[in-house]
Amino acid sequence: MNAEIFVVPTVGELAAFLGRLPAGEKNLIFCEDRLTLEAERAVARAQGVAFDTKVTTFARFLGGGRKVLSKQGSVLVVGGIAASLSGKLRCFGKSPAGCAGRRYETIAQLRAALITPELLDEARAGADRVLADKLADISLVYRGYLDFLARGWLDESGVLSLLPEAMQKGGAAGANVYFVGFSSFTRQAAEGIRAALSLAKSVSAVLIGGEEALYTNEAVHDFEKYCALAGAACRRTYIPSALCPEAEALRRTLFDPAYPVPVNARNVHLFEGADEEDELVYAATVIQSEVLDRGLRYRDVALLLGDPKGSRVALEKVFGEYGIPYYADVKRTLAAHPLARFVLGWFALLSEGFDPADADAFVGSEFFGGDRRSRELYRNYLLHYANYRGGARRPVKEGADDPLVLDALRSRLLSAFDGASAAMTGGQYCRLVRGLLEKFECGKVQDELAAALEGQGLRAESAYMARGLESILRVLSEAEELSGGTKMRAEEFSSVLSEALTALEVSLIPQYLDAVFVGDVAESRICGAKTVIAAGLTDAVPACGADTALITDRDIDRLRTLKVELSPKIREVNARARENVG
């Protein structure tokens, strides 16, 4: 069978292509998670409720019923394995659990490229000493991780290995199969392409690309390569752009060093503000004009920012003053939640022997409980009389103001550590943290804080606050199941837990039916907006990642000479970010 590649210049053209799929035929559409909503909308707009067309991701297509590790679960496992191997690690022995997240990302990258620990061991013979030691450490942890998975677990990478079998059982046979909007294809995903070629009625890829400097065309080349390995030829068809002249001029010249030919623009307006807040004020006035003068709804407007997380405070201030409802499409890491910081602060006190700064932060948290005046009184006492390691454990000194209040708060602080020691199993730590959350009524405090934020009109912040306890309990349950019997020092378990909390990102449900969409100019995928405003477009957009991976670009180049093919390199990731901005 031969395959078709349709190269489209924009997400809008991609959605339009899906809207033209023939009705009455069995269509199976695979796309990246960030594009599923746009793909489903495109199919539904064209065909109504399209029972004959299924839009899915690889993970959703494989379905449930399996013991699948979440990303944070994998981080917990890798961190626990690294901690248990600390005496054998050459490069990462000092803080084995400290980079569990990056170590898991490296293992996932290796698995996606079908690189085994044995291949890493073979590559060590031709590597320099530093790279050889690094590969030895990664291989050790990688083997331990694979041994863990062999007990009946699947992780995000392992799920893809089931794709060919799932295609045979799950409806690919006789269907028109489309691979839509992928930025690249891994060697694992290539097995899915091979299976589709052997089972489907037709196989096509609808991918974003073009001849302009904006595009990497990485996915197009990958798809052609993997089809050729499966014995199939590909035919490329370029879909022309349907953008208005101004937008088309931008598309053709974005990131092109040649200065563009001036174009008369009625639909594009430029404004240069003095600072970020000035730009957002201008954006707010434009939005109000679009809604009040042109009759648009707020949901017809999209605001794309260079750094949505960094602009969060200014955005809340400006849009709050103008009364503009908005939904920020930004995932927030659980590690930044105040309750997560309270839990990690508990571990810091335990592992660092009640350092004064840790004691001050722990007592100062709203989750410590009690009225604020009493907490401030106790914090001032600790600063004046107990500003040394272990000072918070000591009895309240005679002559201190309000000794009864101080003694009650000291007792409350010490009660949080009943039964705790600096070295315990993961399961014991998890049970102690659950006890802490219950004893200090953290659920009740969280509800009060969420209600207060709601009362101030900060709906997104309120929604984020309300998600803390349930998410932390979920991570604790995973930690107990995955590393409950492993004995660790408090700082090791805290480090692994912190990495897992960082890996768990919280997506917020829109709090308004009619709201401006606010997203990342390099990440968001939205093609239904009637007015698009881009702000914060400094020379830092798109953000360029630094080469901080455990296996650097230089290492990847060296491994490729040793017949170990690993990707992507950081420059390839940065090139994809440029394409996403366009």
Pin down the residues of each PLM region.
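ASCE RecA-like P-loop NTPase motor cores
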Residues: 1-27, 68, 72-83, 143-206, ...
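Conserved coupling segment at the C-terminus of the helicase ATP-binding
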Residues: 129-130, 134, 141, 209-213, ...
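Short loop/turn segments at strand-loop or loop-helix junctions that form parts
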Residues: 58-61, 205-210, 535-537
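Short gly/pro/ser/thr-enriched loop/turn and capping motifs at secondary-structure boundaries
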Residues: 62, 212-214, 333-336
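Conserved RecA-like helicase ATPase core segment
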Residues: 189-273
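Anion-coordinating catalytic cores for phosphoryl-, nucleotidyl-, and glycosidic chemistry
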Residues: 2-55, 66-67, 193-194, 242-582
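Glycine-centered loop/turn motif at secondary-structure junctions
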Residues: 152-153, 200, 231, 294-295, ...
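Basic/charged alpha-beta structural segments of nucleotide/phosphate-handling enzymes
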Residues: 34-40, 44-172, 187, 221-223, ...
